[in-house]
Amino acid sequence: MAKLETVTLGNIGKDGKQTLVLNPRGVNPTNGVASLSQAGAVPALEKRVTVSVSQPSRNRKNYKVQVKIQNPTACTANGSCDPSVTRQAYADVTFSFTQYSTDEERAFVRTELAALLASPLLIDAIDQLNPAY
């Protein structure tokens, strides 16, 4: 079990020169969802990440790992507007593994996704909203 602690994400953004520090906000004792967010004066404007791991159940035989990212964008009209969210960007990634999967198989899927997200196909699809042809 990993301890919930500060996570620093470097080399992010379109130019790869941004850093984001996510501070632990706690783990919901009811559903086990761990929350991290960027420290900010206005909670609604904080970038957030949640991570959860669901155990297999009687009806669902697989482990489910869910990672959600929420990045709000603040109003920037010459700095004259009240702090408010003008739009949101979301990402929701779900991994599903059988109880018999190995850590090697799970690591392969995780690193495969990281490499795929860095590929020109996904960069064009996500950044430019261009479909593949």
Swiss-Prot record:
Outcome reported for the amino acid change (mutating R60C): Decreased RNA-binding to the viral operator and loss of repressor activity
Statement: the UniProt record of this protein carries the keyword RNA-binding: yes
Phenotype for K64E: Decreased RNA-binding to the viral operator and loss of repressor activity
Protein keywords: Capsid protein, RNA-binding, T=3 icosahedral capsid protein, Translation regulation, Virion
Keyword Transport: no
InterPro entries: Levivir_coat (IPR002703), Phage_RNA-type_capsid (IPR015954)
Reported function: Capsid protein self-assembles to form an icosahedral capsid with a T=3 symmetry, about 26 nm in diameter, and consisting of 89 capsid proteins dimers (178 capsid proteins). Involved in viral genome encapsidation through the interaction between a capsid protein dimer and the multiple packaging signals present in the RNA genome. Binding of the capsid proteins to the viral RNA induces a conformational change required for efficient T=3 shell formation. The capsid also contains 1 copy of the A2 maturation protein.
Protein name: Capsid protein
Lineage of the organism: Viruses, Riboviria, Orthornavirae, Lenarviricota, Leviviricetes
